[in-house]
């Protein structure tokens, strides 16, 4: 499928995405994060919102604080550290409460305000989209804008890494977005995604094709997750091989739950 690219962003700058929304890209570039985590600054009726503080990086925190001015609220899409890490420092510096879904599996983080599906924060509605993470939220706002975070990214497909990531949930959350009519996605990494629904359809088809390939490869002789990954992702960049193996495991667990595959103790076989 076709992905989007963009030039290396200017570090520390708050660049306009659309009226009332700016983006500061953290300096955590990598094979899993593209140019870095997107931290969004949103002008809202109740004051400025910081969405996804980003990694625990003093330079990034300083850039966000310099660009933001007074902060009314901090929203968090999910509790992966490249999005959560700077939240304590931003909260301490601004006094702004942190709003997030609360996942008991991450005991070191408790938000000030626990969000549930459908909650609205100053015009932005929480849309529960587990899959990439068990506590993942998108946020839907005015004019068809959806902060899609790491559920849908324009530059790459998402990693679904068990146990926090669940492929069955990921499929369901993609279908949930297909039932909506959002017109612009703002992802957790990479450039904005206009006209997103065909892209989401392609993502779902890509994952379904990968699942069909796994089923076609399985037989009576057991195969390890690594062996399946080596077969299905033979051309993958070595830096992404671990992520590919986690995705394959997530597919296998989904197939196991559907009674289409089984782990016989030596490896995976067709059920």
Predicted regions: what they are:
Residues 85, 165, 243:
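Residue-level signal for the nucleotide or nucleotide-sugar donor/cofactor binding architecture
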Residues 1-7, 20, 106-109, 132:
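Glycine/proline-rich low-complexity segments that form flexible loops, beta-turns, and polyproline
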Residues 20, 64, 189, 214, ...:
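Residue-level signal for inorganic ion chemistry
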Residues 7-66, 138-154:
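Conserved beta-strand hairpin/beta-sheet module of binuclear metal-dependent hydrolase folds
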Residues 2-3, 216-271:
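C-terminal regulatory/interaction regions
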Residues 28-30, 34-35, 53-123, 154:
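Active-site HxH/HxHxD metal-binding segment of metal-dependent hydrolases
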Residues 47-50, 55-57, 125-128, 133-213, ...:
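Metallo-beta-lactamase
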Residues 77-83, 132, 189, 251:
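Histidine-centered divalent metal-coordination motifs
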């Amino acid at each position: 499928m076709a992905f989007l690219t963009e030039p290396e962003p200017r570090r520390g700058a708050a660049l306009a995405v659309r009226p009332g929304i700016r983006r500061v890209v953290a300096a955590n570039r990598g094979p899993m994060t593209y140019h870095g985590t997107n931290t969004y600054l949103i002008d809202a009726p109740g004051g400025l919102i910081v969405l996804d503080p980003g990694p625990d990086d003093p330079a990034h925190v300083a850039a966000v604080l310099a660009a933001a001015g007074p902060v009314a609220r901090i929203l968090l899409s999910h509790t992966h550290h490249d999005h959560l890490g700077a939240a304590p420092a931003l909260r301490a510096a601004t006094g702004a409460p942190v709003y997030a879904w609360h996942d008991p599996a991450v005991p070191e983080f408790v938000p000030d305000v626990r969000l549930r599906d459908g909650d609205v924060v100053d015009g932005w509605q929480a849309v529960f989209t587990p899959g990439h993470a068990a506590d993942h939220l998108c946020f839907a706002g005015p004019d068809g804008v959806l902060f899609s975070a790491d559920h849908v990214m324009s530059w790459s497909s998402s990693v679904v890494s068990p146990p926090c990531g669940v492929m069955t949930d990921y499929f369901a959350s993609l279908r949930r977005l297909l039932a909506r009519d959002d017109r612009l996605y703002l992802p957790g990494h990479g450039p904005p995604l206009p006209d997103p629904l065909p892209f989401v359809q392609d993502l779902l088809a890509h994952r379904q094709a990968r699942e069909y390939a796994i089923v076609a490869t399985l037989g009576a002789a057991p195969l390890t997750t690594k062996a399946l990954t080596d077969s299905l992702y033979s051309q993958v960049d070595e830096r992404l091989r671990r992520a590919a193996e986690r995705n394959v495991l997530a597919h296998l667990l989904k197939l196991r739950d559907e009674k289409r595959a089984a782990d016989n103790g030596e490896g995976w076989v067709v059920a």
